[in-house]
Amino acid sequence: MPEIARFYGIVITLLYKEHNPPHFHAEYGEFRASFDIETLKMTGSFPATAKNLVKKWAKPHQEELLKMWNSKKITKLPPLI
């Protein structure tokens, strides 16, 4: 899966060929989760602190993430600082 961001040990990936709803994946050590782009609802197992960091990162990038999903053009996004 193409990596679109990395911060605090969390790797964010997006694969637009997957099932709906539009979502992205996050990995943190042995933990894996997917996040709905529109609602940021999480599916999977992730530590609470890491989950909050992913949501904090994703909130200002929701429009860009959805555009990537729909256009099938993946680009890197800035990390959470």
Question: What is the predicted function of each stretch?
Answer:
Residues 3, 33, 42, 73-76:
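Glycine-rich, flexible loop/turn motifs
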Residues 15-48:
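A short, structured beta-strand/loop element
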Residues 52-81:
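C-terminal structural segments of small proteins and small subunits
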